[in-house]
Amino acid sequence: MIRCFLPALLLVLVLGIALPVPAAPLHENETVKLPCGRTIKVLSVSRIQYSTGVMALMVRYQTTLSVEQQHKALSEEVDDVFKVAQKQVEHDGFHEAIISSNEVPHGIILTSSRMLNFIFERGADGTWTRLGRSEFMAVQ
């Protein structure tokens, strides 16, 4: 009895480890650990429609980095946020996604923060690319 059970148990364990687990959808006010090891706070996840009728999934998150300088660290962080959101974007059938980096608000009575949007577009071959500012303006 145990001899028959052990191979079956081993097979279940191997398959359980080898099969990819689908990513859970992102939720508002959720803290997410990125592949790079940083953690971010998801501010909102929403579906938006451009004036041209194109639908996209927008993920707004809070970053500790400055969005004003658009440095390499912010670019890498945005790419990591997209990697986390990509399964949800594809599952929901979108061909475009917007990742919105929002600085931590500062101020006591009047608070303010800056934000910067990054647009990702899925090509005909299924690969995702991040649009540059000039490409984004041409699409609109």
Report the location of each language-model feature:
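Bacterial N-terminal signal peptides
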Residues: 8-17
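A short linear-motif detector with a strong N-terminal bias
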Residues: 20, 37-38, 75-80
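Short, non-transmembrane amphipathic alpha-helical segments
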Residues: 72-91
